[in-house]
Design a protein with these regions (language model features):
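Glycine-aromatic micro-motifs
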Residues: 1-113
Length: 113
């Protein structure tokens, strides 16, 4: 099983949460203050640099759910899935955008979508 940190439309009560299907919700949590959330219009993205905390949820997902999320999130061509540093040493992966292409979008200072 894999742990996946979601911070946008995959969260509970958002449009793409049903993609997580049989995944097990673990908890609401936040990252360490090492990232930047940006506003892409219909959805957010995070950059692997900055000083913001990102708020989201952690799920335990099997490989089939993870593959579906990869497809929806465009991994590895749009988003890249990699380890994210969460509070209390929780280990999970999240989807990041490449900073070089997305550093001109509006920043969501609160880190909350």
């Amino acid at each position: 099983m894999n742990k996946l940190f979601v911070y946008g439309t995959l969260k509970r009560q958002y449009s793409r949460n049903s993609i997580l299907g049989a995944a097990s919700f673990i908890k609401e949590t936040q990252t360490l203050p090492l990232y930047t959330m940006i506003d892409l219009g219909a959805f957010p993205g995070i950059l692997d640099s900055g000083r913001s905390v990102i708020y989201g949820e952690v799920y335990e997902v099997d490989n089939s759910v993870l593959e579906m999320c990869d497809l929806i999130e465009g991994h590895p061509n749009f988003y890249k899935r990699k380890l994210v540093k969460l509070e209390k040493g929780i280990k999970a992966e999240a989807y990041f955008l490449p900073k070089s292409r997305y550093n001109s979008y509006p920043v969501i200072e609160s880190g909350l979508w």
